[in-house]
Amino acid sequence: MMRVKFNGKELDTDFKTSLEFFENISKNENDVWIINGFATKENIALNEDDELFCIERNTLPPKDALDAMMRARHTPKLHDKLKNGRVAVCGLGGLGSHIAINLARSGVGYLKLIDFDVIEPSNLNRQAYRVSDLGKFKTEALKEQISEINPYISIEICTLEINEDNLKSLFKDIDIVCEAFDSAIAKAMMAQNFHRFYKDSILICASGLAGYGDSNSIQTRKIAKNFYVCGDLVNGAKLGNGLMAPRVNICAGHQSNLVLELLANKE
């Protein structure tokens, strides 16, 4: 007899292998079997405290089962830190929409999504929206999309334009803010004023991600305490050098990956 965790709950079992265990539990050959964070149908010897999941394909697991699966995928300590993280994304265009989706998929527990704009056709070349979203506020469309990816995280939306007046009150309960504006003026305003009001919060900005070409020129740099910039610092959007999906996504990946690293290392 050994004790394992099955779908997030402790269970005593006499079965010695995963095949014996799942064939006794699962009545549908299409069910997904997950052992210690990995989906597999191989026959593996079971050990004390193994984490096992049997999930019906094409259905949403209950909240506790999904949470337990993500803990197994990420390792428990990391998952708990991400789940307790509070992150704001400012600007929900090509950068911000993908940053928010990355963080939702990773299990960040609270997202504050801020933008004033609506979705229009020119956004579709790089932003995480669909034709069916045209005319919707980006905040509302992105919340709807994220709710279909991870319905168990908390999402707050603010459909407004950030300025020096409202900046001082928007991020009082936020650990990390991702700046993802299109406007150079808005970027400068955020970089110059954010730490006047939030000395202990982290700001991650973006600069230089337009065009195509060298992927590795996009880097993450620490500029000062609690202040980071992702991008190549050179290629801004301009006439003849527009924003294109691949490099925008690379930069969004840098920003969202840095969020995970910072939350993981948070004391």
Spans of model-derived segments:
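Eukaryote-biased recognition of intrinsically disordered, low-complexity regulatory segments
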Residues: M1-L11
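Glycine-rich phosphate/adenylate-binding loop
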Residues: E23, D31-F38, E56, K172-I176, ...
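N-terminal charged helix/coil linker that caps or initiates catalytic domains
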Residues: E42, N47-E48, F53-R86
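Glycine-rich phosphate-binding loop and adjoining beta1-alpha1-beta2 segment
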Residues: D115-N150
